[in-house]
Amino acid sequence: MADQINMGGLSLNEGGHQGPPQGRSYIPPHMRGRGGPPPAGPQAGGPPVMNGGPPAAAPGPNGIGNSAWANQNYGARQNNWSNDVPTYQGNNNRRGGWGGRGGGYSGGGNFDGHSGGGGAPTARGSGDGQWRDGKHIPGPANPRVERELFGVTAEDPSKQHTGINFEKYDDIPVEASGTDVPEPVHQFTTPPLDEHLCRNIELAHYKVPTPVQKYSIPIVSGGRDLMACAQTGSGKTGGFLFPILSQAFINGPSAVPANAAGQFGRQRKAYPTSLILAPTRELVSQIFDESRKFAYRSWVRPCVVYGGADIGSQLRQIERGCDLLVATPGRLVDLIERGRISLQNIKYLVLDEADRMLDMGFEPQIRRIVEGEDMPQVQDRQTLMFSATFPRDIQMLARDFLKDYIFLSVGRVGSTSENITQKVEYVEDVDKRSVLLDILHSHANGLTLIFVETKRMADSLSDFLINQNFPATSIHGDRTQRERERALEFFRNGRCPILVATAVAARGLDIPHVTHVINYDLPTDVDDYVHRIGRTGRAGNTGIATAFFNRGNRGIVRELMDLLKEANQEVPAFLETIARESSFGGGGRGGRSRGGGGRGGATRDFRKFGGGGFGGNNNGGGGGFNNAGSQGAGFSAGGGGGAGYGGGAGYGGGAGYGGGGYGNPSGPGAQSSWW
């Protein structure tokens, strides 16, 4: 390790590596080898005592851990954690504090319009307009709601949105394939967008459309189906919300079906006209928050439903009106079975992060929603699929859901952005905590997102950071929805600028101002790596992504090298060495193999470049998506002589595609947090 890692002056101990602290206070690299300063009392406004640590006036074992230097170092960090953060309550009381597993942050109050009981957010602030005599009449302005939705100024850190730095990125390559592709737009203007929507876009401080929005707005407004493949952080959410809401404002609500007559009171059924499906609770909540912004003062009432929250509050929200529904597949199936939602009026169907929903075993629910209920047929609706990657097998599946669609590929999708400086460091497992502390001390500003592989590691690492006087919290599937929402909110606003996360937060979340992403544990699939580091460098901004690599990660070494080369990043020599070792040992990709076709088809329209099979040999013998079903034979149903996608007995590694039916998309014993 000593020969391979260069961390800006990091000095190692006599054993050749820097081990965990073992009861000693952490000493930053530039202070090592010096004598400790004399004891000093706490400075005014210094950080609170955390996690039952020693009093602020007492020096650490090396005379440094609680010195004036430590207080000064905190004061230099962005947002000045010490000014307005309540005292952490310690490990003996797991119900509060940044890292407490029992309750997340202990402060009260709600945010983003969410209800206090962990249920669904209300539609407050939207749906105030009317549709009268064939015209859209916006509601009156509400300064309080505007502050909540859009912030006080464009520089408001709690509401500032990425997507405003694309003015200098007009040269981003865009590929649009299909018949009669409309010309892109270059401004948010009327037409093609509705005048009221343009006012809301201005309130949100959007300046110019992002590349994906330039093309998606005229495509969707023209009535075409769309498969959009665009980099994470490129404005995909606005890419489908803008044209859908604009058409709603122009055309008005749909008539209630004749068979809905006589439905009154609490048991009446909702008939949304737009349905947006996404894989995780966090992502649907984020899309809902964005839809509230752009539906402000309009007749459109957005609603959101997801598992893990009180279904009663979600039903009450739907009863107040539901025109645009954002949902996870599992909870939507539940509400359909209860007879509370009908898809009879759907004009727009959006599948966001479509490849992830299929990876997570949601295909049975999606097929039931799209093909097995009362949703209009493919010819009678518009269907939009958005994601950062669309491997060839997912494109083949799109033939069942889309008609005469336009394939849109923006930028070098399926890869990473040059706005992200990627660093890969060789770090053995025993050294990870020590190297992490070095990085956190050397990158003092902005928000840091740390990815780990297990829920236990997320809690353990956040507790460790708190013990080292770093305000940190964790987010993972075992936390309640309310705890996860609080953790994300305090991470967004900078009160808790270090977030340790499992894969539950890896995809889709739009958290502005994340300046550093650290892959403490590398994933086994390079696509997951792409999505993780996509949390920084969003929408033209710059960011840093650091990965801790060792020989345990050799399964993705070749694809990681390809990504680094494609993004014009430095490829460390040790990656070349381990790649050669793997070639002799027969090593290869450790994760899922996307049909053996690598990443070559992830960004191109298979209709142009050919689409024989799903890639590789995994479709031999008549297997594949359509006839694997829930036979327990896996993704390829015996094709290519393998057990299929799940590596065992089915898509989710359980029994058949879902293992556990509609209730748990990943089978018994798997995480239920995804839905």
Swiss-Prot record:
Location of motif DEAD box in this chain is 352-355
Major enzyme class: hydrolase
Extract one GO molecular function annotation from the record: ATP hydrolysis activity
| Position of sequence motif Q motif | 186-214
| Polar residues composition bias: residue spans | 69-89
Low complexity composition bias: residue spans: 46-68
> Region Disordered: what ranges?
1-143, 582-613
Reactions the enzyme catalyzes: ATP + H2O = ADP + phosphate + H(+)
Report keywords, A-Z: ATP-binding, Cytoplasm, Helicase, Hydrolase, Initiation factor, Nucleotide-binding, Protein biosynthesis, RNA-binding
GO cellular component assignments: cytoplasm
Q: What is its main location?
A: cytoplasm
Q: Where does ATP bind?
A: 230-237
Lineage, top-rank taxon, reads: Eukaryota
Give residue ranges for domain Helicase C-terminal.
Answer: 419-579
Q: Which residues form the Helicase ATP-binding domain?
A: 217-408
CDD domains (UniProt xref): SF2_C_DEAD
Give start-end positions of Gly residues composition bias.
96-120, 584-601
What Pfam families does the entry give? Answer: DEAD, Helicase_C
The cellular location(s) given in this protein's UniProt record come to: Cytoplasm
Similarity annotation: Belongs to the DEAD box helicase family. DDX3/DED1 subfamily.
Record comment regarding domains = The Q motif is unique to and characteristic of the DEAD box family of RNA helicases and controls ATP binding and hydrolysis.
What exactly does this protein do? ATP-binding RNA helicase involved in translation initiation. Remodels RNA in response to ADP and ATP concentrations by facilitating disruption, but also formation of RNA duplexes.
Q: What is this protein called?
A: ATP-dependent RNA helicase DED1
Task: State the organism of origin.
Answer: Gibberella zeae (strain ATCC MYA-4620 / CBS 123657 / FGSC 9075 / NRRL 31084 / PH-1) (Wheat head blight fungus)
Q: Which gene encodes it?
A: DED1
